[in-house]
Amino acid sequence: MKNVIDPFISLSYWPSAGGFGSNTNILETNIINSSVVLSVLIYFGKGVLSNLLDNRKQKILETIRNSEELCKGAIDQLEKARACLRNVEMIADEIQVNGNSQIEREKEDLLNTASDNLEQLEDPKNETIYSEQQRAFDQIRQQVSRQALRRAIGTLNSRLNTELHLRTIDHNIGLLRTMMNTND
């Protein structure tokens, strides 16, 4: 155990550094040792560093490939979506055209039906007007006939006297006798 502790004890006898400064003695600065260590680090570190850089490069290239594949997939999906959109737009246009033509047909049918209904309503109305006109004409004729009959009766009553009345009766009796004689 003594052998293990001896190097540490010997460290306690070394003089401590006086601080930072530049040492101009080449042998004390250990430039050769530093350059050897640096050369070894460069020689072995170069391989490690190049391996790290190659791994990083591979990861970046793989990420770029994956991104390009995802981009191609997205472009394919976009094209499919655009094609689907075009189909949907064509179908929507057809539906709109068909809908507009259907609306026009139904509008024309509705107008024709309304026109037919008006004609059907006009016929009874015209018949009613005609029958009302006929009834009015008949009433006017009856009133005119009654007035003419009243005037005629009034005129006859004012002009007829008893003598004319007796002569008319005699004349009518004579006509009846001749009619009876001709029938026998």
Curated annotation (Swiss-Prot):
Keywords: ATP synthesis, ATP-binding, CF(0), Chloroplast, Hydrogen ion transport, Ion transport, Membrane, Nucleotide-binding, Plastid, Thylakoid, Transmembrane, Transmembrane helix, Transport. It is found in: Plastid, Chloroplast thylakoid membrane. CDD domains: ATP-synt_Fo_b. PANTHER family: ATP SYNTHASE SUBUNIT B, CHLOROPLASTIC. F(1)F(0) ATP synthase produces ATP from ADP in the presence of a proton or sodium gradient. F-type ATPases consist of two structural domains, F(1) containing the extramembraneous catalytic core and F(0) containing the membrane proton channel, linked together by a central stalk and a peripheral stalk. During catalysis, ATP synthesis in the catalytic domain of F(1) is coupled via a rotary mechanism of the central stalk subunits to proton translocation. Component of the F(0) channel, it forms part of the peripheral stalk, linking F(1) to F(0). HAMAP family: ATP_synth_b_bprime. Belongs to the ATPase B chain family. This is ATP synthase subunit b, chloroplastic. It comes from Pinus thunbergii (Japanese black pine).
